Amino acid sequence: MKILLASLLIFISFSSNAMTGNELYEKFNEYKKVNQNTIDIAFAAGMYAGYVDGAVDTFQVLDILCPSSLVTRGQLIDTVGKFLENNPEVRHKAASSLVYNALKDIFSCKKE
C-alpha cells in the first residue's frame, strides 16, 4: 500500500516534470561535469540532484526509504547515478521508480 501511495504521490509531484531514467541519466552525466562551469551543465546537474533529493524526501516521509542520518546527499546522488550507469536497460522507465530501485536494497526501512 505504501508503495502504491508513494508512486501516486511521486506521479502527482513530478507529473509536470515527469522524466524517464534516460533523461535522469543525462542529467547525472552533466552533474559529473559540473566543475567545467558552464551554465547548461550546472543547470542539468542541479536538476539531477534536485530530482533525486525530492524523490528521496518523498520516500522518507512515507517511511519507504530510511537512510541513516550519517548518509550524505552526495552518497544518495552517487548511488542513483551508479545504478543508472550500471542498468541502461531500465532507463526508459519512470525516473522516480529508478531512484527507488537504486536505493531500496540499501536504505529500506526496517519492518517492526
Model-derived regions, located:
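N-terminal signal peptide c-region/cleavage motif recognized by signal peptidases
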Residues: 13-16
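Short N-proximal segments of mature Sec-exported proteins
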Residues: 19-81
